[in-house]
Amino acid sequence: MSGEAPRVAVDPFSCPMMTMQRKPEVHDAFREAGPVVEVNAPAGGPAWVITDDALAREVLADPRFVKDPDLAPTAWRGVDDGLDIPVPELRPFTLIAVDGEDHRRLRRIHAPAFNPRRLAERTDRIAAIADRLLTELADSSDRSGEPAELIGGFAYHFPLLVICELLGVPVTDPAMAREAVGVLKALGLGGPQSAGGDGTDPAGDVPDTSALESLLLEAVHAARRKDTRTMTRVLYERAQAEFGSVSDDQLVYMITGLIFAGHDTTGSFLGFLLAEVLAGRLAADADGDAISRFVEEALRHHPPVPYTLWRFAATEVVIRGVRLPRGAPVLVDIEGTNTDGRHHDAPHAFHPDRPSRRRLTFGDGPHYCIGEQLAQLESRTMIGVLRSRFPQARLAVPYEELRWCRKGAQTARLTDLPVWLR
């Protein structure tokens, strides 16, 4: 027999400003209601949230649940609803919007670029980027007498400059990085579409993309000349092998997607990770293994995305006795499964030495985040640079006063992180 999921009145897509001492109660409410709960979707109509860890892993691996945005309710549009809607000729090059063999082909193209050994070879360069950014912030703080602000000044710039470096895109300083991200977001490239739903600014302003296009094409043309071993070169070689040929536009689309994926959620997480380190929760004599465990616990405790991106039922599906119609929008509650007391003792506490490493922060199944190794490397490298170069670094406000918020179901982030680096 099949029936309906329990309906939960709380809104999973709104979150008041929070402090570090408080977590949203919605996840506990979902878990108590059942493994599958029904909620109101942002654009209206029903949506379903998976709250149970084992069921979540089943759903994320089930080919009946797909990322195809064509199955989304027709009333949904753009970034307000967390959709990625690439133009048809570019969809085969979009990891987060294709399934099945198309997705497996893209994974084969991208996987060599994220080979752990290849990434480890760039550790010194990644450390140099972190060192430069932190030193510039420390010098500015010394001159002004004000604490450095590490969210806007470091947490987002660091992974952005790293991914651009790895791709061979010559974005070399924070000002260039901010401009590039502003243009990409306005166009809706490489990530969820803009709020206007058509790739333009909702107000009708079309940004000047010529400077950014020049930088992206510079990376693509260098990759075609075989005079570089960047990620873009690897993508080009693999795409040629899979598709026979690949255009400049297609390569540009792939690398813009990696620029977004390589900095936005990572920047959110690094803010939380920095807060935990600067609050003194990492032992002064922590070795590499202890730092890795610390990062793992931060990933469990502070997932930068509280829910997965949308999936849709490709056909009618019954899970745990609940019937989902074709096209049913489905989310997995990442934060809720990460803090399930059935898998973790004191699940809402931050314990770096806890034995269980069970978490869904990077997803599961075929769409498991391909950039996990890079995010982990950036996290460990950042901690190493901070502790070796700025051993006196400390929070400028009490940990308990740090505030964070969410943007719908998509990202959780600290509003600011004032720090005395020296």
Curated annotation (Swiss-Prot):
Native source species: Streptomyces sp. (strain C5)
Pathway membership: Antibiotic biosynthesis; daunorubicin biosynthesis; Antibiotic biosynthesis; carminomycin biosynthesis
Identification of the protein by name: Cytochrome P-450 monooxygenase DoxA
Top-level division of the source organism's lineage: Bacteria
Catalysed reactions, semicolon-separated: 13-deoxydaunorubicin + NADPH + O2 + H(+) = 13-dihydrodaunorubicin + NADP(+) + H2O; 13-dihydrodaunorubicin + NADPH + O2 + H(+) = daunorubicin + NADP(+) + 2 H2O; 13-deoxycarminomycin + NADPH + O2 + H(+) = 13-dihydrocarminomycin + NADP(+) + H2O; 13-dihydrocarminomycin + NADPH + O2 + H(+) = carminomycin + NADP(+) + 2 H2O
Cofactor(s) the protein requires to work: heme
Enzyme class: oxidoreductase
Gene, per the UniProt record: doxA
Main location: cytoplasm
